[in-house]
Amino acid sequence: SNDGFRACDRAARQLLGKRSSSVFPVPPRLALAPLTYEEINLASKAQCGKGVSKQAFYLLPKIRETEALLRSSYSDDLDWLETHPELCFSSFNGAMPMEDNKKTDAGFRERKTVLARHIPARTIERLLRDLMASVPRAQCARDDMVDALVCGVVARLDAAGRDCLPPGGQEFDEVGLPMRICYPIPTGSQ
């Protein structure tokens, strides 16, 4: 969005409670320009009254890539869903946010346990082992791999198995792209 504020992000933070900081503010659309961090940060402060986090800045190449694909003719053939891993884990955990930080050993185990309700544990272990052997840690940490797996599980759900934020409707950004976060209907709510 032009201002970096999205109702779906606010709603996700509310649902995540103590894990709400995992939904960090998206950068405003101006950040898609190929500028330095300092230039983007200053422009964002001038336009929106807030800067851009380093975490968001480092995601910009992937955001640009996704934006280009969503705005291409290929997007007509795809059913795109935005999701958030912590919201997915929380939902698969009975709408209870994860207890431990995903970067810790306990948090990693906790997320694998929740995933094992939807993917056989041996499959999870094989996938993680193969990924860790083939992808440099500097490019993808183990917690990011588990995040990708939970997002893959959600992508396979049909519409009856998921809900979207914000509740009661969908926002669109200035170029017509949907601003929504899809997540599994919490376990026990189906």
At which residue positions do the language-model features occur?
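RNase H-like (RuvC/DEDD) metal-dependent nuclease/polynucleotide-processing core
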Residues: S1-Q190
